[in-house]
Amino acid sequence: MNKNTNDFEIMAPIGSRESLAAAINAGANSVYFGIGKLNMRSHSANHFTIDDLKEIAETCNAKGIQTYLTVNTVIYGEDIETMHEIIDAAKAANITAVIASDVAVMMYCRQVGVEVHLSTQLNISNIDALKFYAQFADVAVLARELNMDQVKEIHEQIIKQNICGPKGQPIRIEMFCHGAFCMAISGKCYMSLHDSNRSANRGACTQICRRSYTVTDNETGNQLEIDNKYIMSPKDLKSVRFIDKMMDAGVRVFKIEGRARGPEYVHTVVSCYKEAIESVLDGTFTEEKKDQWDERLSTVFNRGFWDGYYQGQKMGEWTKDYGNKATEKKVLIGKVIKYFSRLGVAEVAVEANTFVKGEKLLITGNSTGAMFLNAEEIRYDLNPVDKAEQGWRVSIPVPDKVRPNDKLFKLVVN
């Protein structure tokens, strides 16, 4: 493969300042986020507001990181004015691009000079559809239901037919590489609206597909035996073991799902996929590394993993349990009081739970992001101790700068 790391982009999800810092520190090339209304996670993440756009853009631009604002819900007539306000604010803040699914959003972005990327909600599955949308957008997310042979064919046709976006460059292909999978095609689900009058297509999904269900014969009242109660809850996508095939197929932007996830999720997933892409490029993409990435990815939020449809699988794989199957869970200990830069030591308040020497710790914060460390040493009143008790203030060595009021957790086997 005659490529370098600059040809590929890892796009991180952010729903909070903590996850933004985690994405930056882990080496993401771009971030995507919403600001309340008109995005597909408007009810499930700690969203930023329109007033945060300038700060986010300035923070990311200083690091050379692209910023993508999601305005990708169904748009009704009464939403047009709000949509215009959001796009105008994005332009004023120097946001890199808007992720859109409604043509009204695309047209207004083009009118005012804002770059457009196509959302997964469009379910783009063939070259003719992509050619139509190329008049609006420079980057397109292809449908998650495609396999890599189909993706490669689309990529080859982009090159052969010289299908370019408004910037005059060939359309870049973006694909989801990791995270939650919807039971409906490209997320176009109506179950939540039917059950709770909350539309998934307006960012208000209640995720009732994640519950367990029984099948009952209405005439007899008998319940039918099924092999899995979670008949509509897919496992999460994980592609790190075959990221090389995605790169070969023409995928250039690797999108991570998870705007509602914590900073430890963002940091872990971004760093694993960044390492994987670099390993493919430098010829060290080994089975041993794949196993290590698998292990690390299993420690953060997941519902079990499968390959999606990317390698030709026709049927979905469903989770066997409800909720998070991560191998580790975080337990709140307390907070950071002070950081001593010359010593590389943090003073922490032990408030909610104790911790002992050798335990795995996590520190999170708006600027710190997610910092993983081991409690190699604990000192209380300058004396070494093996256990930090509730109510104590202790000092621990940390690998980098932390800030007052950063949260301290221990990570325990789940």
What spans do the regions from the language model cover?
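Well-ordered mid-protein domain cores that form the structural environment of catalytic cofactors
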Residues: M83-S119
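Aromatic- and glycine-enriched glycan-recognition loops and surfaces
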Residues: A45-K54
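Short, glycine/polar-rich helix-capping loops at beta-to-alpha or helix-loop-helix junctions
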Residues: S125-L130
